[in-house]
Amino acid sequence: MMPSRTNLATGIPSSKVKYSRLSSTDDGYIDLQFKKSPPKIPYKAIALATVLFLIGAFLIIIGSLLLAGYISKGGADRAVPVLIIGILVFLPGFYHLRIAYYASKGYRGYSYDDIPDFDD
C-alpha cells in the first residue's frame, strides 16, 4: 500500500491521493514522453474525398461520351460544362486520396495531418 500525504500538524491524511517516491537514479525523463502517439485517421475526410473522386470520374466519363457523340447528339454545348465540373470535382478527391494512401503506406513526407478534417 502506498503512503498517503499527511498533515504534519494533525497527523491526518489530507487527501485520498496516493504518493510514491521517485527513484533516485531517475534523470527526469519518462519513456512515454518520447513515444509517438498513433496518427488520428480522418475517416470522414477520406470518405468525402472518395465520394468526390467517384462523382468526378463519373462526370468525366459522361462528358467524354457526350463530346464523342455516343450518348446524344448535343455536341460540345452539353459536354464541355459536364467535363469542367467533372474535372473540378475529381481533382480534390484524387489529391486527398493520394495523400491518404501514401500516409497509410508510411511514405516519407506524407501524413494524415495533411488532410483537412472535420473537427466535431
Curated annotation (Swiss-Prot):
GO terms for cellular component: autophagosome; early endosome; endomembrane system; late endosome; membrane; recycling endosome; synaptic vesicle; trans-Golgi network. It comes from Bos taurus. It is a multi-pass membrane protein. The keyword DNA-binding does not apply. The modification Phosphoserine is found at residues 15, 23-24. GO terms for biological process: synaptic vesicle transport. Disulfide bonds: none annotated. It is found in: Membrane; Golgi apparatus, trans-Golgi network; Cytoplasmic vesicle, Secretory vesicle, Synaptic vesicle; Early endosome. Involved in trafficking and recycling of synaptic vesicles. This is Transmembrane protein 230. The chain crosses the membrane at residues 51-71, 79-99. Belongs to the TMEM134/TMEM230 family. Coiled coil: none annotated. InterPro entries: TMEM230, TMEM_230/134.
